[in-house]
Protein backbone atom coordinates (compact mmCIF):
# COMPACT_ATOMS: atom_id res chain seq x y z
CA UNK A 1 0.00 0.00 0.00
CA UNK A 2 2.83 2.37 0.82
CA UNK A 3 5.63 3.13 -1.61
CA UNK A 4 9.08 1.97 -0.54
CA UNK A 5 8.34 -1.72 -0.05
CA UNK A 6 5.67 -1.32 2.62
CA UNK A 7 7.94 0.52 5.04
CA UNK A 8 6.48 3.59 6.65
CA UNK A 9 8.35 6.65 7.83
CA UNK A 10 7.27 9.94 9.45
CA UNK A 11 8.24 12.01 6.39
CA UNK A 12 5.75 10.02 4.30
CA UNK A 13 3.10 10.68 6.93
CA UNK A 14 3.62 14.44 6.61
CA UNK A 15 3.34 14.17 2.82
CA UNK A 16 0.13 12.14 3.13
CA UNK A 17 -1.36 14.68 5.54
CA UNK A 18 -0.50 17.51 3.14
CA UNK A 19 -2.13 15.62 0.25
CA UNK A 20 -5.23 15.00 2.36
CA UNK A 21 -5.52 18.72 3.16
CA UNK A 22 -5.10 19.57 -0.52
CA UNK A 23 -8.08 17.31 -1.30
CA UNK A 24 -10.23 18.93 1.40
CA UNK A 25 -9.70 16.18 3.98
CA UNK A 26 -8.77 16.86 7.59
CA UNK A 27 -8.02 14.31 10.31
CA UNK A 28 -7.97 14.85 14.06
CA UNK A 29 -7.27 12.48 16.95
CA UNK A 30 -9.84 12.53 19.74
CA UNK A 31 -8.86 11.85 23.34
CA UNK A 32 -11.51 9.21 23.95
CA UNK A 33 -11.52 7.24 27.18
CA UNK A 34 -14.20 4.71 26.23
CA UNK A 35 -16.40 4.04 23.19
CA UNK A 36 -19.61 2.00 23.34
CA UNK A 37 -21.48 0.80 20.28
CA UNK A 38 -25.01 -0.44 20.98
CA UNK A 39 -26.16 -3.33 18.81
CA UNK A 40 -29.58 -5.00 18.92
CA UNK A 41 -28.50 -7.80 21.26
CA UNK A 42 -25.16 -6.72 22.75
CA UNK A 43 -22.77 -3.86 23.35
CA UNK A 44 -19.27 -3.44 21.95
CA UNK A 45 -17.11 -1.60 24.48
CA UNK A 46 -13.71 -0.22 23.53
CA UNK A 47 -11.55 0.67 26.55
CA UNK A 48 -8.75 3.18 25.83
CA UNK A 49 -9.46 3.33 22.08
CA UNK A 50 -7.69 5.39 19.47
CA UNK A 51 -10.39 7.51 17.85
CA UNK A 52 -9.81 9.62 14.79
CA UNK A 53 -12.34 11.86 13.09
CA UNK A 54 -11.87 12.63 9.42
CA UNK A 55 -13.66 15.55 7.83
CA UNK A 56 -14.07 15.15 4.08
CA UNK A 57 -15.83 18.15 2.59
CA UNK A 58 -18.18 18.49 5.56
CA UNK A 59 -18.84 14.76 6.05
CA UNK A 60 -17.33 13.37 9.24
CA UNK A 61 -16.13 9.79 9.52
CA UNK A 62 -15.08 8.32 12.85
CA UNK A 63 -12.43 5.61 13.00
CA UNK A 64 -12.15 3.53 16.18
CA UNK A 65 -9.09 1.35 16.74
CA UNK A 66 -8.73 -0.94 19.72
CA UNK A 67 -9.84 -4.20 21.23
CA UNK A 68 -13.62 -4.52 21.56
CA UNK A 69 -15.18 -6.32 24.48
CA UNK A 70 -18.61 -7.85 23.83
CA UNK A 71 -21.04 -7.23 26.66
CA UNK A 72 -24.52 -8.74 26.94
CA UNK A 73 -27.22 -6.13 26.75
CA UNK A 74 -29.48 -6.17 29.77
CA UNK A 75 -33.14 -5.59 29.15
CA UNK A 76 -34.27 -2.34 30.59
CA UNK A 77 -36.40 -3.13 33.55
CA UNK A 78 -39.27 -0.82 34.25
CA UNK A 79 -40.73 -1.35 37.65
CA UNK A 80 -44.24 -0.32 38.47
CA UNK A 81 -43.88 2.00 41.38
CA UNK A 82 -46.96 2.90 43.33
CA UNK A 83 -47.02 6.61 43.90
CA UNK A 84 -49.14 7.98 46.68
CA UNK A 85 -50.38 11.47 45.93
CA UNK A 86 -51.07 13.79 48.80
CA UNK A 87 -54.58 15.18 48.50
CA UNK A 88 -54.98 18.76 49.72
CA UNK A 89 -57.92 20.16 51.68
CA UNK A 90 -58.50 22.60 48.84
CA UNK A 91 -58.95 19.72 46.37
CA UNK A 92 -61.25 17.87 48.77
CA UNK A 93 -63.41 20.99 49.24
CA UNK A 94 -63.62 21.58 45.50
CA UNK A 95 -64.71 18.01 44.71
CA UNK A 96 -67.08 17.94 47.69
CA UNK A 97 -68.77 21.20 46.66
CA UNK A 98 -68.87 20.35 42.96
CA UNK A 99 -70.46 16.93 43.48
CA UNK A 100 -72.49 17.63 46.61
CA UNK A 101 -70.85 14.80 48.60
CA UNK A 102 -69.18 14.63 52.00
CA UNK A 103 -65.52 15.50 52.41
CA UNK A 104 -64.74 11.86 53.26
CA UNK A 105 -66.29 10.68 49.97
CA UNK A 106 -64.44 13.38 48.04
CA UNK A 107 -61.12 12.45 49.70
CA UNK A 108 -61.64 8.74 48.97
CA UNK A 109 -62.45 9.46 45.31
CA UNK A 110 -59.37 11.69 44.95
CA UNK A 111 -57.11 9.03 46.48
CA UNK A 112 -58.51 6.37 44.12
CA UNK A 113 -57.65 8.49 41.06
CA UNK A 114 -54.25 9.71 42.36
CA UNK A 115 -55.41 13.27 42.94
CA UNK A 116 -56.90 13.87 39.48
CA UNK A 117 -59.64 16.44 40.15
CA UNK A 118 -61.54 15.96 36.89
CA UNK A 119 -61.46 12.17 37.20
CA UNK A 120 -62.71 12.33 40.81
CA UNK A 121 -65.59 14.64 39.82
CA UNK A 122 -66.56 12.37 36.92
CA UNK A 123 -66.37 9.33 39.19
CA UNK A 124 -68.63 10.87 41.83
CA UNK A 125 -70.98 12.37 39.27
CA UNK A 126 -72.04 8.92 37.98
UniProtKB/Swiss-Prot annotation:
Assigned keywords, A-Z: Protein transport, RNA-binding, Transport
Which protein, by its recorded name, is this?
Nascent polypeptide-associated complex protein
Quaternary data? Homodimer. Interacts with the ribosome. Binds ribosomal RNA.
User: Domain NAC-A/B: where?
Assistant: 10-77
In its UniProt entry, the species of origin is given as Methanococcus maripaludis (strain DSM 14266 / JCM 13030 / NBRC 101832 / S2 / LL)
The record's function comment reads: Contacts the emerging nascent chain on the ribosome.
A single GO molecular-function term is: RNA binding
Has the keyword Repeat been applied to this entry?
no
Per its UniProt record, what Pfam families does this chain match?
NAC, UBA_HYPK
Q: Which GO terms describe its biological process?
A: protein transport
Protein family (similarity comment) = Belongs to the NAC-alpha family.
Amino acid sequence: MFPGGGKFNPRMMKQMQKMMKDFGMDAEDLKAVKVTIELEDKLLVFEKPKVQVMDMLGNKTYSITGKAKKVAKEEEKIEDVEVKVEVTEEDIDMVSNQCGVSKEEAKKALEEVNGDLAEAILKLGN
